[in-house]
Amino acid sequence: MTKIVEIVNETRLLRAQGVTAPAGFQAAGITAGIKVSGAPDLALVFNEGPDYAAAGVFTRNKVKAAPVLWTQRVLSTGQLRAVILNSGGANACTGPAGFQDAHTTAEAVAAALSDWGTETGAIEVAVCSTGLIGDRLPMDKVLAGVRAIVHKMAGGVTGGDDAAHAIMTTDTVPKQVALHNRNKWTVGGMAKGAGMLAPSLATMLCVLTTDAVVEPAALDQALRRATAHTFDRLDIDGCCSTNDTVLLLASGASGITPPQADLDDAVRHACDDLCAQLQADAEGVTKRVTVTVIGAASDDDALVAARMIARDNLVKTAVFGSDPNWGRVLAAVGMAPVALDPDRLCMSFNGAAVCIDGVGTPCARDVDLSTADIDITVDLRIGDSAATIRTTDLSHTYVEENSAYSS
């Protein structure tokens, strides 16, 4: 469903468009046979220029997948012309052979684009993978798919939509966004991720595009500021992937250089909306939960406390059962390594006070948590800092999906 809202500077936000909404980009998504299911599994995003500036942020997991290592290396130039993404296999924990597979994939994309008429080098190609950890990719199918996908590229809605479908794993719907600035420049994006969503980006692949004229350093600033307040604050299950990658490419096709503040704002809004879509489609989700800690001594304390609550399985199962068990929330925040006074803690569910000065209110057990959106707010009453984490409940379906993922 198309979603249009008005945000800062009269920018239009639409979910029916994605990476090809900005001028200068084409994309495609095809079935290469990587997935046993026969679902689409190979995507390509191509920057037609005239500029090729790029930036990226990656998982902080020490066990990094081969495509992450490859893409970190090529991004040292601050330039990208293409991103090739596969679902159906993570190419993680595959050793030197897996890294060579990523390199070979980039070379194949460069060769196919060059044959298509756009001279491209492997060092200009980012590689992203998602799926089961520990197995090498079927390179015969990957390389055949690379040769085919170049001829399927399209601009407009079609190419971006096909690409967004092709990167899905346990996702049930594609995630896309486009922000059209009134000053005639655009930011678009697509993301995937439904499980292993935790900070250090969440488990996800995300490609963002813009037709603004932007230097790599400015892109890097915008992306890092955005991810720190969006993807890094989406925490579904506390598990951090080996493959997390967020890339931002700029074509310069609009001819417009926006102020840094406007670029920062647009990228953050795009990331924030994609985060909301990822949260809504998380594995086994029945409740979308927002955990906010206010009154903390510092921003770091607020973030740590909110994350402690969001990751607590007893809190998450209580939310799943629509049980207003506020004691579990206080028990969780009490374990956070932050400054707090238990006799000053206040808390609410969906705006209804359930705890004041560390003691439950008379109607605390009567709060209705049967709605799909749950807001948990804890006031430490120590300082002025605040932070919010997005999470979900913990359902039977989540356990079932993740107990048989590799079988």
From Swiss-Prot:
Catalytic reaction annotation: N(2)-acetyl-L-ornithine + L-glutamate = N-acetyl-L-glutamate + L-ornithine; L-glutamate + acetyl-CoA = N-acetyl-L-glutamate + CoA + H(+)
NCBIfam families tied to this protein: ArgJ (TIGR00120), PRK05388.1 (NF003802)
EC number per UniProt: 2.3.1.35, 2.3.1.1
Cross-referenced Gene3D superfamilies: arginine biosynthesis bifunctional protein suprefamily, ArgJ beta chain, C-terminal domain, L-amino peptidase D-ALA esterase/amidase
Pfam family name, one: ArgJ
Keywords annotated in UniProt: Acyltransferase, Amino-acid biosynthesis, Arginine biosynthesis, Autocatalytic cleavage, Cytoplasm, Multifunctional enzyme, Transferase
The protein's name in its UniProt record: Arginine biosynthesis bifunctional protein ArgJ
Subunit and interaction comment: Heterotetramer of two alpha and two beta chains.
Catalytic-site annotation from UniProt: T203 (nucleophile)
Protein family according to the UniProt entry: Belongs to the ArgJ family.
Species whose genome carries this gene: Mycobacterium leprae (strain TN)
